[in-house]
Each structure stands twice: as structure tokens, then as C-alpha cells.
Amino acid sequence: MRIRVPATSANLGPGFDSCGLALTLYLTLDIGGEAETWYIEHDIGGGIPHDETNVIIETALHLAPNLTPHHLVMTCDIPPARGLGSSSAAVVAGIELANTLAELNLSKEEKVRIAAEIEGHPDNVAPAVLGNWVVGAKLDGEDFYVRHLFPDCALIAFIPKKELLTSESRGVLPDALPFKEAVQASSIANVMIAAILRNDMTLAGEMMERDLWHEKYRSKLVPHLTQIREVAKSKGAYAACLSGAGPTVLVFAPRNIANTLQASLQTLEIDADVLLLDIEGSGAEVFY
């Protein structure tokens, strides 16, 4: 059996800690035979555990403590600490592992609830489970979210080789915003959501780049954001915004300029991968 979970990009600018989009990069987990102890075979490095302390197995055992150990093989296109939902993908993979081996028959709604409980909010985990674009909120311990089709466009991910921990990126955020600024920030997010629902990527893109919640504070940690925006706009892109906490920048563009824009971004003197991606519509899947 094989479990596949997509990468996700949270925020989309002003949709801070609420919006998330599934992307065509994947964490893939092949379930092998039973074993005496849990073991995840992978060549990712970075201190990611091979035993039951791995987040995937920890999550699975949290849901089904009596699971029989298995040999697992993990491959992952999602680079860690880049703002592409790698930790959320691992949590969702663990939920799918428990659901498959223990035959829990969890609904998608239950999977989102469990994952959001573990991660703290649904902005990454909901699109990882459901696919496409999700707007959500966690209120008084309850998850509220809406899945909707995102407008058709090209996605270009500018992924620096240097990682940025979410804890570091959150550390630069203020404890509070002045009331008038919060009202303006909220109105920008509202217009972005409405524009996306109307398939108006031109207006949505303008709002994406006017975020007041987090990007201006995080820009000191992601100095390449301004440079990428300038290149993207000069080529006709809709917008460029931080993916999650960064340092990845996600560019939204008309499909007919995607290859040209990708080539232009590859010429920047920043050590990074520049990937042409699509919106992932299915979310987490299990293949038998």
C-alpha cells in the first residue's frame, strides 16, 4: 500500500493562519511488511528519525496505540522548514497510516479535525487532507472550514536552499496590531477571498501583495521577497507572496507566461530551486 500527501502553502498573503492551498509536491509512504520494531527507510537526512520517534509513526500510534510495527519507506519532495507544509504532511501521513492499518474508517472531516488538533490550526492540514484551496478557522476548539476550487493559474515556487524555522519566523511577529490596522488587514483578506471566489486573479493578486498581518515583519528574514515580486510583476504575474512562514515564495501567474517567468527567476543570484507546480486537487490518497 502507498500513502501520498501533498505539500501545502498557507496564508496566500493576507489569509494569515486561515487560507491554504495544496501543491503538486508529495510525501509518499510505502507500507511494507510487519516487523519487530517500527522502521522508516528514507534518505532525507536532516536528523529526521527512522524509528517510532518519527512524527508519522508518533501520530499513527497516538490514534491506534496497538498498531503492529511495519517497515515503511518514505520519499519526500517537500523540503523541510521551507514553508511548504512538511510537518503537516507528516501528520496527515500518520493519520492515514493508522486509518489504513487499524481500519479506523475515519471520514475526511475527522482526519482534518485530528490533524488540526495536533498542528494547532487547519490552514495546512485541511488542504493536505482535502486538496485544492481551503479557508478555515479554529474557534473554541472547533474547526470551521470551506473547500473551494482555486482559479486556474500557474504556480511557481521559489524555494531557497537555506531553511527558515517556523518558530524563528513567528518570533518576529508583533503581539498585537492597532485596531484600525487590524480592520484594514481584515478588509484586504476579505477582498482577496471574494476575488478568488469570483475567479478574479488580478484583484486577488493585488490583495495578496497588500498583506498587513505578517509579511512586512517577516521580510527582514526573507529579503528576496521584494526582488522576486519585482521580477514577477515585470513579467505579468498576478502576485508573489510568502508560502507559509517562508522562506519559499509562491508566485501566481497566467499559464502562458509560466515558463518565461520560471526562467527569469532562475537567473537570480540566490541559491534556490525554482519549480513550476500545479494546484493539487485530490488531497491525501491511499493506493492499494
From Swiss-Prot:
InterPro entries to which the protein is assigned, alphabetical: GHMP_kinase_C_dom, GHMP_kinase_C_sf, GHMP_kinase_N_dom, GHMP_knse_ATP-bd_CS, Homoserine_kinase, Ribosomal_Su5_D2-typ_SF, Ribsml_uS5_D2-typ_fold_subgr
Keyword Cytoplasm: yes
Classification via PANTHER family: HOMOSERINE KINASE, HOMOSERINE/4-DIPHOSPHOCYTIDYL-2-C-METHYL-D-ERYTHRITOL KINASE
GO cellular component labels: cytoplasm
Pathway the protein takes part in: Amino-acid biosynthesis; L-threonine biosynthesis; L-threonine from L-aspartate: step 4/5
Keyword Transferase in record: yes
Keyword tags: Amino-acid biosynthesis, ATP-binding, Cytoplasm, Kinase, Nucleotide-binding, Threonine biosynthesis, Transferase
Organism: Listeria welshimeri serovar 6b (strain ATCC 35897 / DSM 20650 / CCUG 15529 / CIP 8149 / NCTC 11857 / SLCC 5334 / V8)
SUPFAM superfamilies cross-referenced by the UniProt entry: GHMP Kinase, C-terminal domain, Ribosomal protein S5 domain 2-like
PROSITE patterns: GHMP_KINASES_ATP
Annotated function: Catalyzes the ATP-dependent phosphorylation of L-homoserine to L-homoserine phosphate.
Catalytic function, reaction form: L-homoserine + ATP = O-phospho-L-homoserine + ADP + H(+)
Protein name: Homoserine kinase
Binding site for ATP: P79, P80, A81, R82, G83, L84, G85, S86, S87, S88, A89
Enzyme class: transferase
Encoding gene, per UniProt annotation: thrB
Cross-referenced NCBIfam families: thrB (TIGR00191)
Enzyme Commission number: 2.7.1.39
Family: Belongs to the GHMP kinase family. Homoserine kinase subfamily.
Gene Ontology biological process terms, A to Z: threonine biosynthetic process
Principal location class: cytoplasm
Any one GO molecular-function label of the UniProt entry: homoserine kinase activity
Intracellular or extracellular location(s): Cytoplasm
